[in-house]
Amino acid sequence: MQPIYQYAWIIPFVPLPVTMSIGLGLLLVPTATKNLRRMWAFPSVSLLSIVMVFSADLSVQQIDGSSIYQYLWSWTINNDFSLEFGHLIDPLTSIMSILITTVGIMVLIYSDKYMSHDQGYLRFFAYMSFSNTSMLGLVTSSNLIQIYIFWELVGMCSYLLIGFWFTRPIAANACQKALVTNRVGDFGLLLGILGLYWITGSFEFRDLFEIFNNLIHNNGVNSLFATLCASLLFAGAVAKSAQFPLHVWLPDAMEGPTPISALIHAATMVAAGIFLVARLLPLFTVIPYIMNLISLIGVITVLLGATLALAQRDIKRSLAYSTMSQLGYIMLAPGIGSYRAALFHLITHAYSKALLFLGSGSIIHSMEPIVGYSPDKSQNMVLMGGLRKYVPITKMTFLLGTLSLCGIPPLACFWSKDEILNDSWLYSPIFAIIACATAGLTAFYMFRTYLLTFEGYLYAHFQNYSGTQNSSFYSISIWGKEEPKLVNRNLLLSTINKNEKVSFFSKKTCKINGNVRNLMRSFSTHFDNKDTSMYPHESDNTMLLPLLVLVLFTLFVGFIGIPFDQGVMGLDILSKWLTPSINLLHQNSNYSVNWYEFATNAFFSVSIAYFGIFIASLLYGSVYLFFQNLELINSFVKIGPKRIFLDQIINVIYNWSYNRGYIDVFYATSLTKGIRGLAKLTHFFDRRVIDGIMNGVGVSSFFVGEGIKYLGGGRISSYLFVYLSYVSIFLLIYIFFFRKVESIKLFQTKNGIPLYL
């Protein structure tokens, strides 16, 4: 056993000193800590880099054939109950550690510049370091109790990060929504853990799997109860990984800063649910109903996430629903028995999605000086377009991330997604058809996002910022894209008088086709003899460096799953890496597929992706804009019943997507209003009934006491008289009532009448 394994317990705690130091600094020497705030990025990156090197060494040891290592120490020693803590090092742990640290380092470097202007800079890095600590603790946990502790810490960190700008009501509501939604899954996870302990008497993974499998095979446990416990465990993963129907928190989580979105969607919170399913898969595999449930939830999430992304205008929300759909693929894979493909896609998707989110942050950063610092404008793709000329490096990196997510070879996601699609055909043709159709939808909405952002014109220059637009000046294309029709660019880009000092937009008005409209001045504003460009600008090198590094991962990380062994797949790095875990699942560790079969299946999936890209290019690309500007569409396509029916279908799809499938509305009307109504009813019952009884007894006692006080007059003889009077009355009632009852019983006995009559 390598000595490095003995020190693996330190992995989760290495980033923690940053959080503690920032907290103590703000508490003891707040002024000095705030003045030196930019220095905290360096220790954050440095400490996480140490963990990355440590994790890389562990990964190399795993690939070279090291076995699973577990170290435990007892927390409590009792004859009836034993609780042990420790760390578990296996391929799954090493994979997750590499993902968390590499993506985390890129996000921290990026955030140093992105958050430099923010007053919460120190708080941001404290939260980020604590989030990395929580996630590293989760993936190294050796039992379910540790899993649950760090699971809750990850949820708390996501709450703090999503609500980072808590003074904004939308952000405050978003973090509360994420917390409440995840509490549903967390409660199920807790019940499932307690149920499994009741069945097996152990929290340790190895003991738990062995005992549970023996009980299932020997019918030693009620199958319905075992299925219920496993379903409750899976509920925790459903909520944390934003699977249907507990996915509603994910798009609202975009209210946090963009680096937080990259970290949550790539390597931390949403990956935690996938990690839990992968960790407990040996338990799930012995219950066929759970495997069917996992695959069903996965395929529903795949399709739902893709359809909800079709009409989003916010660039971050579009990527959020993309994450939801891709997580559906990752959840589908273990459900159909494809453990290797699930972890493969988890790796490739993490780097591609981190690249896309950080790229979107660069885009937002470049748009904010033009449209303002409101997320409703700076993240709105309707106001973007034509950015390829202004942010070429961001454009190149975003395009590569988009193509990777579309499944275009030789980029990373192609290899992993294609493996899932191939395995789905072996499991269920229906699931395979849905997965393949969603691959086309993925290519469509991802390329739609790219085209709306980087192609065409910069539509912010054609927008008046009162929130309205000239109807004749605009042509609204399919699903929210605003396009100029026969625009005189010289008129729109007319220059201002250099002797004037004005705000961003002129108050002059001019006539355009008979309509009065605010005329935008030249996008160069003069402040104190200094020209400030009002076009987007490329981000700082500190923000571009992580993008370029993630591009390298996107280009080459897919090769870890590609064999180089004369045509039969089975000797690739990933298969060697996962051999101990696959053997634990009692599967054949030699993953072999003929290259000819692989190429045939890949051709089909790539064709679907290219078809989606082609449709997106037709609807949002330069070809569509060319025909629209020449007004040739209506010349060739006559408006008839078929055209009207097609438009109605498009409107239905658009409304479904834009309104989030009406799922949020359903929850708001049924659950939220129902719970509030129940709370009001409970409040009424508590105040009027319970408190009414208590208050009524008190008031009655008060009046009785007052009456007796006035009746007695304060003399002892009067009190004795009243007391004797009450005693006499009770004696008379007793004599009259009980004597009458005894007489009736005696009469019945003498006459032979049953006593119960």
Curated annotation (Swiss-Prot):
Swiss-Prot/TrEMBL catalytic activity: a plastoquinone + NADH + (n+1) H(+)(in) = a plastoquinol + NAD(+) + n H(+)(out); a plastoquinone + NADPH + (n+1) H(+)(in) = a plastoquinol + NADP(+) + n H(+)(out)
Topology versus the membrane: Multi-pass membrane protein
A Gene Ontology biological process term: electron transport coupled proton transport
Main location: plastid
Source organism, top-level taxon: Eukaryota
The keyword Membrane is assigned to this record: yes
Key word Transmembrane present: yes
Regions that span the bilayer: 9-29, 40-60, 89-109, 122-139, 147-167, 185-205, 219-239, 258-278, 280-300, 327-347, 354-374, 396-416, 425-445, 544-564, 607-627, 692-712, 718-738
GO cellular component, one term: chloroplast thylakoid membrane
Matches recorded under InterPro entries: NADH_UbQ_OxRdtase_chlpt_su5_C, NADHpl_OxRdtase_5_subgr, ND/Mrp_TM, NU5C-like, Proton_antipo_N
Disulphides: none
UniProt keyword annotations, A-Z: Chloroplast, Membrane, NAD, NADP, Plastid, Plastoquinone, Quinone, Thylakoid, Translocase, Transmembrane, Transmembrane helix, Transport
GO molecular function, one term: quinone binding
EC number: 7.1.1.-
Gene3D superfamilies in the record: 1.20.5.2700
Pfam family, one: Proton_antipo_M
Subcellular location(s) per record: Plastid, Chloroplast thylakoid membrane
Family, similarity comment: Belongs to the complex I subunit 5 family.
Task of the protein: NDH shuttles electrons from NAD(P)H:plastoquinone, via FMN and iron-sulfur (Fe-S) centers, to quinones in the photosynthetic chain and possibly in a chloroplast respiratory chain. The immediate electron acceptor for the enzyme in this species is believed to be plastoquinone. Couples the redox reaction to proton translocation, and thus conserves the redox energy in a proton gradient.
NCBIfam families for the chain: NDH_I_L, PRK06590.1
Subunit structure: NDH is composed of at least 16 different subunits, 5 of which are encoded in the nucleus.
Protein name per its UniProtKB record: NAD(P)H-quinone oxidoreductase subunit 5, chloroplastic
Upper taxonomic lineage: Eukaryota, Viridiplantae, Streptophyta, Embryophyta, Tracheophyta
Gene designation per UniProt: ndhF
